[in-house]
Amino acid sequence: MFLDERLEKILEILKNEKKVKVADLAAKFNVSEVIIRKNLKRLEQEGKLKRTHGGAILLKELAHSSTLEERVINRTKPKEIIARKIIENIQNGETVFFDITSINYIAAEYLANSQKEITLITNMPSITTHFNKNSKIIIIMIGGEYNKEIGGNVGIEAINYIKKYNVDKAFVGSAGIDLEAGKVMNFEANDGNTKKEIMNISKKIFLATEYRKLGILGNYKFSNLSDFDTFICEKDKKDFLESYKKIFDKSEVEIL
């Protein structure tokens, strides 16, 4: 097993069990306790855990804010996988809402290159650059105050525009998901309240974000996990930690 893979596995165990022991990890990974201590020291330096006598405990990780442009540039494999899953769950004739996320930005690119015929509503102006005059996608742009940090239109004016519509499906992102409390979070109230209204007008609501966001905290709770119908990430349900599966099952949220 490579070092990075072992570090990821250690964090997964920590998220599941909240604490680990050096001896147990050494036995599990068939390496020396010296190596495990070095691994835990590195993870502590990265702010992922706190070392204790003979082991370590989990630190709750806070989400870090960045602009939409920065997130789009950071076009990771998980984002690509999620974007493709989004397109697979859109059918011809539907009206769909894309929330302001880098994943939805990528999904819009795939949508523009597909043969799908839908109506796309969004409050993220930058995605319109993907669609040319030959596109079969009808685009409705939500107006309102443009937030440069978030990369889209949010706040009371945007909310009033959104209230005028009904959609079949909405794809919403988040900065983090507090699984213990069942809270879905972002960074600030205007964006959060806009997301709430997007959810209010949707028949089916998808939470589309990376697996690593599970257990990360944002600044503002905009929804409960149980308010969503489906969770889309880069992993299949069989690859989730058992404790995570139980939380999603209890919340009656499907995992794709």
Q: Where do the language-model regions lie?
A:
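Conserved SAM/SAH-binding loop
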Residues: 104
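Conserved SAM-binding loop
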Residues: 120-121, 187
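HTH-adjacent hinge/linker in prokaryotic transcriptional regulators
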Residues: 2-23, 28, 34-100, 109-119, ...
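Conserved phosphate- and dinucleotide-binding cores of soluble alpha/beta proteins
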Residues: 2-5, 12, 21-25, 78, ...
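Short N-terminal helix-initiation segments at or just after the protein's N-terminus
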Residues: 30-41, 63-66, 117, 148-152, ...
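Short secondary-structure boundary/hinge segments and terminal tails
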Residues: 61-62, 107, 180, 216
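Active-site catalytic microenvironments in core metabolic enzymes, especially phosphate/sugar-handling
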Residues: 125
